[in-house]
Design a protein with these regions (language model features):
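Conserved BB-loop
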Residues: 24-56, 72-78, 128
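Residue-level signal for short, function-critical loop segments
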Residues: 11-13, 70-71
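An anion/phosphate-binding loop that grips the pyrophosphate of nucleotide cofactors and donors
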Residues: 62
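Conserved TIR/SEFIR loop-to-helix hotspot centered on a Trp-containing motif
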Residues: 71-89
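Generic beta-sheet signal
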Residues: 68, 96-98, 118
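C-terminal interaction surface of TIR/SEFIR-family domains
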Residues: 1-8, 15-27, 35, 100-217, ...
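Arginine/glycine-rich "motif VI" loop of SF2 helicases in the C-terminal RecA-like domain
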Residues: 28-31, 84-93, 99, 105
Length: 253
């Protein structure tokens, strides 16, 4: 383990690129005097290393933890587990909020910590001032906070877009299970649908989101009465944008 002061950056896998941006900024701003642990960067966790042991060692040896908190990550157990592990060790933990979550929206127990918003320059000044304290420095390095925010914004805009798409897809599939093959197989571009009216109420909003984003085209053109009630008949077609841009990204997740 490095002899430098260590900053543990806690994040979920989908936010690894944001963790790397923050890691690089910390290292360059403090001229390499601070090291970072980012579990997805291929450097903090050597190939073949025991993952949990490496995490535990990094938590034990870290001087501060920055937890990347988004609407997605705060619902994952590891973010809370790692924050709790550092808190028990009396290691400072700073929740850094992004992608639609603000520090005022943090849930308990993360709300009990002093959080910061990634898109707020004053909050970033606080975070980097905390890092400077670790080194015993009286002043924080000169940092282009607006430039850092802009770097992060590129990731966040893409990330929130794909989360919106993913949520709409899963909502559609929950409303009508037969759509799973359409959205995930990559072998079907269009499918006829006959869906019970009460299910359509849940399906339509999800399809509208995807339609507005140019990812699906759908029409419902008639109804029929079956033994199970009223059904709506229609057709759902995936656009080339969905098949070429969205589907590969979903399969990587």
């Amino acid at each position: 383990m490095t002899s430098k002061k260590l900053v543990f950056i806690s994040h979920i896998n989908e936010e690894r690129e944001l963790a790397k941006i923050l890691s690089e900024e910390i290292k360059s701003s403090f001229l390499g005097l601070l090291d970072t642990f980012v579990s997805s960067d291929g450097e903090s966790l050597p190939a073949g290393g025991r993952w949990l042991d490496s995490i535990d060692a990094a938590l034990t040896n870290s001087a501060i933890q920055i937890s990347l908190c988004s609407p997605q990550s705060i619902n994952r157990p590891w973010i809370n587990f790692e924050a709790g592990a550092s808190w028990i060790r009396r290691i400072p933990v700073v929740p850094l909020c992004h992608s639609g979550l603000s520090k005022s929206g943090l849930p308990i127990p993360l709300a009990m910590l002093q959080g910061a918003d990634l898109d707020n320059a004053d909050d970033l000044k606080f975070v980097f001032a905390e890092l400077a304290k670790i080194l015993g420095a009286a002043k924080t390095p000169t940092i282009d906070y607006c430039g850092l925010i802009d770097k992060c914004k590129i990731f966040i805009e893409t990330y929130t877009y794909f989360n919106k798409v993913r949520e709409a897809i899963y909502a559609a599939c929950n409303a009508e299970q037969q759509l799973e093959k359409l959205f995930f197989s990559g072998t079907i571009q269009s499918i006829p649908v006959s869906i019970q009216d009460y299910r359509f109420v849940h399906l339509a909003p999800a399809l509208d989101v995807l339609k507005d984003l140019g990812l699906v085209i759908y029409t419902f053109h008639g109804t029929r009465i079956g033994s199970d009630g009223l059904f709506r008949n229609g057709n759902i077609t995936l656009t080339d944008k969905y098949l070429n841009v969205i589907l590969p990204r979903i399969k990587q997740a």
